[in-house]
Amino acid sequence: MEFKFIETNGITLRAAVEGEGPLVIMVHGCPESWFSWRRQIPVIAEAGYKVVAIDVRGYGGSDKPYAVEEYTIKKISDDLIGVIDFFGEDQAILFGHDWGGPIVWYTSLLNEDRISAVAGLSVPYFPQREFSPLDAFETIYEGKFFYQLYFQEEGVAEAEFEPNLRKYLEATYFSIDARGMKKQFENPLNAMDKGSDAKYLDGVIEFDDYPNWINKDEMNYLINEFETSGMRGPLNRYRAQRKDFEDLKNYKDQKLKQPA
């Protein structure tokens, strides 16, 4: 595996690259990096593909524009098309996880001739509707804490997370794995059910040991990545959702045509 720095859409992305064959681009979510795909990269490369796992703009070794509007689905979609062009290919297969899911779904919708197949983990494809997801969240979670609404005011979540990266990353990762979900079901009055004036880390589930799917050295790598990049870029993706709604409103109810 090697790192390449790819100039695309006016910025530079860092990508982990391995293998030869049809192009597969892997897109991580939040809070993650190319490193999330570390176990899948060699397997897919060995199966006969060129695997390119990017750091999404705002993360890791990639450029980090400041403005919220630089983090729309449309902007990041154009980044991916530039990656395909960089490798001299006409098409690519896309994999996405978490925020990478909507990114690859809509890249496929907006660029039907450039994406041959697409797969997403954890976030399904949601066609555009008559309202922004943030409007729905404001109604559903009125008077309660919801992380995506908490992330909307610039600087607030950054001020909480950046001095506490280990706690933030461990809490985010561990609270939604099997052990964390079990604890949440055992105690309904948990960190997922708190007032709208709460902070993200208030009442989070913590564990003394690591689960079997990540070790401390791997977590330290991720912490170092976020110490370098900061949290503004990752959080701006959440803030860009109203602009996404405006950009994509003409695609209401459209289905993907690629194998998915």
Go through each PLM region and give its residues.
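Conserved Rossmann-like nucleotide-binding pocket used by diverse enzymes
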Residues: K4, M26, V52, F95, ...
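Conserved HGGG/HGGXW glycine-rich cap/lid loop of the alpha/beta-hydrolase fold
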Residues: R14-D63, V83
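N-terminal cap/lid segment of alpha/beta-hydrolase-fold proteins
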Residues: M1-T12
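Short, flexible hinge/linker loops that cap or flank conserved catalytic cores
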Residues: E7-N9, V17-G19, Q254-L256
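Residue-level detector of flexible, active-site-proximal loop/helix-junction positions
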Residues: G10, P22, Y125
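Active-site donor-binding loop signature of nucleotide-sugar glycosyltransferases
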Residues: T8, V56, V123
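Generic structural signal for short, solvent-exposed loop/turn connectors between secondary structure elements
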Residues: M1-F3, G19-G21, R129-L134
